[in-house]
């Protein structure tokens, strides 16, 4: 990411997938700041993450306020609960009430909500806070550049497969012109960074990832892959029932030789297992 020339990033739910120590290391390695207004706590670099950051570009002062989604129950982002133990999260929409004062600062030309909430969350921000000029979003992996009554929204897909070129004219703190362009980074006509390609290939060329560990005679759907995955766990752990969240299974088992890279594609998180005794009457599905 340092090689992409980022100026700033928001913390998203998957930043926590490998634990707080790893995330703290990644933040310290980054040559750009992370922001997130609706969480607190943590150690190391996590304790230093700012709520917002002001960046000056070509004479324009831009305030970036960060926010991450807090899951279906509003308690923590969609990651393993153990990975966010000791951290405290607040409502990512309501937290923007605390930052209205930023728009009153005459030195700020543009207020940007840099979010990992998904499309519906970004829409709520523009519906509720007219001081936000632009929402740069993520999480739901959409691709769009839209104008709403109170501001603008953009999102650029996932995994850096695409970027958004957004061109705006600003006059007296107001966006007077907005143009949005999608740039597909898989386009073969784009110039490639050869040194970066070599670095990526270095990680991909680990022989242990491609060692044969099995064979599948058919292609599996996601549901079938889930059945295979949970049945394998049941056999190894020797239990009666295995419960696995569907979002934790990220790929399908395909026909052919099975290698560790296939398994990591199916289960990239390495969340571990909890084994416990429960009665049928206590099990509520």
Region roles according to the model:
Residues 1-189, 195, 222-232, 242:
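Acidic, metal/ion-coordinating pockets
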